[in-house]
């Protein structure tokens, strides 16, 4: 009896990968049939297998035209291929176009709320920990220690959620003479690290999809990796040679610098009318506490009385007349939600923190869903090609530097690197922007945020203008030096490889992202700060063995992956150590059991195979039953 494929004249091999809960052992087809169709075809047998995700199979020359395919029961894509849908009517087409056009203003509205929620989030952190940040800055004996100064910069920037605020405080302390330029440089480095926590938090909102989360977390942590690597090289160099102090001193001495105005409000012109209705802060309280003015110790950060908006005085008005006019100006009550509540700063800060996080998460989720629906098919391909395509040869190398200029310009417009990097993080998660393109954009954002400190320094008194401008330039040259270290040559772009490794780890163990945030921005800085307070002897005694152990582990890992033959047999893997010392699997089991204790028990289902990730698949070995490499029999969850 002739089989179905023989009656058709032979099998037609389909190059498409198939998804699976059924195993097809029989002839291949020109299209992908469903299980119901296969059951009606004589000579074709299906076997149920446990599989939850696609397994891409390459074509193999099998005898009798037999191939192996796996697919889901009645997936939507296969159903569309089996039955041809009628052409949509004109009214349906118009409805689809109208829906897409309506999504654009909605998306812009959610983006506006997203940026406003970041501003309110910064205000919430300042209310909750602003005075603590001022107290930390006040102790000059601590700040004279470079390592302690670095940690102070990290913690203060995490507390106030704004590197612009922390660097402006540092510039104010330098201009008032309370802090030397050499002592302020490590704090500037720490503020650069602390500002990257915002977009890492934003990346957590895409944890629902492992692939999107892997890309988004890698795109967010590439900023962290760049800052940490730059500090590991430049902080010891600065402590030993004073490189940044001397270079910026020469630059300041060679220019005739005059005072200017504060940073221009570009994006705030749009966001402030809304955020001022929620909360208004008197940020001079934090700066006054930092410079040692105890008169404002018990003063609330919440602004109660505001000066009415008036037209700017003419430039011909004398200084005495201007001061007199300000003295005679009547103050009026501010117009925001918390002006008459009488709540303490901490309570208002916690309320705003919870509310801004809810709005932030909601806007981000809706933005991602709308971008997913808009960026489909040819539209997504065009955008990806435009953003990720390099310039034609021989100007390919210019593409990254052009992206830096774009990132710096956009950050100058929004006056916040956190806003810019948080805005591109969802696009990285969706795959619209590649990590290789996001890296120079982030570096440009690092440069763009230094303009805030430079413009704040230009507003300093004339007698302290040079020192204030010098510390602002230290911020600029620190980022330029980091770019020269970790960007020009492809082999030096370690932050990209480190970020991708972190992304893969968090895609496998999603709780690792929260652990990363706690360790890198809270526990590790606090531990280093405590050790540094015990003196340089304790710092050297603890830091030297730890640094040597870390260097040894990194070296062995590199040799294990590239040339294991150069290592002793027992050191070619970490299996000689207890499992918890070289794998997160035991901790993952504990966390899984702890979370399942609070979950409602579900009906028991057949046991699924363990999660296997592509990068952890064993070397290909022949399968005795199918005569195919083992990779093609694995199921990736």
From Swiss-Prot:
Subunit note: Interacts via its C-terminal region with NHERF4. Interacts with NHERF1. Interacts with TMEM174; regulates SLC34A1 internalization by PTH and FGF23.
NCBIfam families: 2a58, Na_Pi_symport
Compartments where located: Apical cell membrane; Cell membrane
Listed result of changing residue 597 to S: Reduced protein expression and transport activity
Domain of life: Eukaryota
UniProt similarity note: Belongs to the SLC34A transporter family.
Entry-annotated residues carrying Phosphothreonine: 506, 621
Task of the protein: Involved in actively transporting phosphate into cells via Na(+) cotransport in the renal brush border membrane. The cotransport has a Na(+):Pi stoichiometry of 3:1 and is electrogenic.
Segments crossing the lipid bilayer: 104-125, 146-163, 217-236, 346-368, 411-434, 465-485, 512-532, 538-559
Disulfide bonds, paired cysteine numbers: 225-520, 306-334
A GO cellular component entry from the record: plasma membrane
Stretches of the chain found on the membrane's Cytoplasmic side: 1-103, 164-216, 369-410, 486-511, 560-637
pH and activity: Optimum pH is 8.0.
Species for this entry: Rattus norvegicus
Protein name: Sodium-dependent phosphate transport protein 2A
């Amino acid at each position: 009896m002739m089989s179905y494929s023989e009656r058709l004249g032979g099998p037609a091999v389909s190059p498409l990968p198939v998804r699976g809960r059924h195993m097809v052992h029989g002839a291949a087809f020109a299209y992908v049939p469903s299980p119901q169709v296969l059951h009606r075809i004589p000579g074709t047998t299906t076997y149920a297998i446990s599989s939850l995700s696609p397994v891409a199979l390459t074509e193999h020359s099998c005898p009798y035209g037999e191939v192996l395919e796996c697919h889901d029961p009645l997936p939507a894509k296969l159903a569309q291929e089996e039955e041809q849908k009628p052409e949509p009517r004109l009214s349906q087409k118009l409805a689809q176009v109208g829906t897409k056009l309506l999504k654009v203003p909605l998306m812009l509205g959610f983006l506006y709320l997203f940026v406003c929620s970041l501003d309110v989030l910064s205000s919430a952190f300042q209310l909750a920990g602003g005075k603590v940040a001022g107290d930390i800055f006040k102790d000059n004996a601590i700040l004279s220690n470079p390592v302690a100064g670095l940690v102070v910069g990290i913690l203060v920037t995490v507390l106030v959620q704004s590197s612009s605020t922390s660097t402006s405080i540092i510039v104010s302390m330098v201009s008032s003479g309370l802090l030397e330029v050499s002592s302020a440089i490590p704090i500037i480095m720490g503020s650069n690290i602390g500002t990257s926590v915002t977009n890492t938090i934003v990346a957590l909102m895409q944890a629902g999809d492992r692939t999107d989360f892997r890309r988004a977390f890698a795109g967010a942590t590439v900023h962290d990796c760049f800052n940490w690597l730059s500090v590991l090289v430049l902080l010891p160099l600065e402590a030993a040679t004073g490189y940044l102090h001397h270079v910026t001193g020469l630059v300041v001495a060679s220019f005739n610098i005059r005072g200017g105005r504060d940073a221009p409000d570009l994006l705030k012109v749009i966001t402030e009318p809304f955020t001022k209705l929620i909360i208004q802060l008197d940020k001079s309280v934090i700066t006054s506490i930092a410079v040692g003015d105890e008169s404002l110790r018990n003063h609330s950060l919440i602004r109660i009385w505001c000066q009415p908006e008036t037209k700017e005085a003419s430039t011909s008005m004398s200084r005495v007349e201007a001061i007199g006019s300000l003295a005679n100006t009547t103050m009026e009550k501010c117009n925001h939600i918390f002006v008459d509540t009488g709540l303490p700063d901490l309570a208002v800060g916690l309320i705003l923190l919870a509310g801004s996080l809810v709005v932030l998460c909601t806007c981000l989720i809706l933005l991602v869903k709308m971008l997913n629906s808009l960026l489909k098919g040819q539209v997504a391909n065009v955008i990806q090609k435009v953003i990720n395509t390099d310039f034609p040869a021989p100007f390919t190398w210019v593409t990254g530097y052009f992206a830096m200029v774009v990132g710096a310009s956009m950050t100058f417009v929004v006056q916040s690197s956190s806003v810019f990097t948080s805005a591109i993080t969802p696009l990285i998660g969706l795959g619209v922007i590649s990590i290789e393109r996001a890296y120079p954009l982030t570096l440009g954002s690092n440069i763009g945020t230094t303009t805030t400190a430079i413009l704040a320094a230009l507003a300093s008194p004339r007698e302290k203008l040079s020192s204030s401008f010098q510390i602002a330039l230290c911020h600029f040259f620190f980022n330029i030096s980091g770019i020269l270290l970790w960007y020009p040559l492809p082999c030096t772009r370690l932050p990209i490889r480190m970020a991708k490794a972190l992304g893969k780890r968090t895609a496998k163990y999603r709780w690792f992202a929260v652990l990363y945030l706690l360790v890198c921005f809270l526990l590790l800085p606090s531990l280093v700060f405590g050790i540094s307070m015990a003196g340089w002897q304790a710092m050297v005694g603890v830091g030297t063995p730890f640094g040597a152990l870390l260097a040894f582990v990194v070296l062995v890992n590199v040799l294990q992956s590239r040339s294991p033959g150069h290592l002793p047999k027992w050191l070619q893997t970490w299996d000689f150590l207890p499992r918890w010392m070289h794998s997160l699997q035991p901790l993952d089991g504990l966390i899984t059991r702890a979370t399942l204790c609070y979950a409602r028990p579900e009906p028991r289902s057949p046991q699924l195979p363990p999660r296997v990730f592509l990068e952890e698949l064993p070397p290909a070995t022949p399968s005795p039953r199918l005569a195919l490499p083992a990779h093609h029999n694995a199921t990736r969850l």
